[in-house]
Amino acid sequence: MSSFRFRFLLFSLLASSAVLPSFSATSELCNADDKRALLRIKKAFNDAYVLSSWDATTDCCEWNNVECDGTTHRIVTLSVLRGGLSGSIPSAVGDLPYLQNIYLHKQPNLTGNIPRSLLKLKNLQYLTLSYNNLSGPIPGFLGDLVNLIFLDLSYNRFSGTIPSSLSNPPNLRSLRLDRNALTGSIPTSLGHIQGSSPYLYLSHNQLTGEVPAVLGDVDFVYIDLSRNQLSGDPSTLFGRNKSAQQIYLSRNMFEFNMSEMEPPQASLIALDLNHNKIFGGIPAAMTGVTYLQIFNVSYNRLCGEIPVGGRLQTFDSTAYFHNRCLCGTPLDSCK
């Protein structure tokens, strides 16, 4: 190859590489409106270090803590886990109209209320704001997020009553409001949750009153009402043909005849009724619950012999003690 041709080829290669950066700049996938919204969120969080990859000169689809849709290249996920954020949730989060998933989890310095701007997120399916320091009332407008499937506000400082509108989303499958400071009664509207195989967590609050009978119309897979101040008869939650796997009702003031209870025999793996005012005896049908792994009826007013069979004798005496006159293995024999 002649020296002239070599120099020409080298010049061509250098010229080609020189224009590559300008080509890359014009090929950014991130939507400009989404990028501006994210940068406003970063500014509201005082340029938190956890968001340091959010650089205005780079493609936001390549940033950490967010995810772009593979086709539209719009931001569909905002996820910041385990610290790094302080202040309140910026209203600019509502300026990401294609968001489907929000996960702000274990942010002890995340405070304030849930902003009303989230109402604009009509595509939102998963909203997790757990293990933070959010406070104030739970906003009823969350029930207007029609595509919501999973709502988790657990481990915060929310107060006030449970909005009846939270059961409105037609595909809601999981509602977690546990570990807050909620008061008042359980709204009857929660008996209209329509999502398949629903989960309901209301434990560790200050809820009062009776469990609405209409909750028995919902085939909950998991229900936890423990550690409240609830009373009355929650036995509509039970049923031989229900699909419940875990039922936690401990440390309330429930009062019903356990002898008449029909446990979900094919699916139940956990039943905790300790520290209530439950009377009667343990039904023989409990011996047919073949997958039972957690069982506790201690600190109630039960009497009679513990039925023999199934898994009932695999639990130690602490699952049965401090009842009125319960007897039989693993307790003392009946006289």
Regions found by a protein language model. Give the residues of each.
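The feature encodes a structural signal of leucine-rich repeats
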Residues: I89-S91, T111-R116, S135-G140, S159-S164, ...
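LRR flanking "cap" motifs
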Residues: K43-S91, M253-E260, G328-K335
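Consensus "Asn ladder" position of solenoid repeat domains
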Residues: G83, Q107-P108, N132, L153-N156, ...
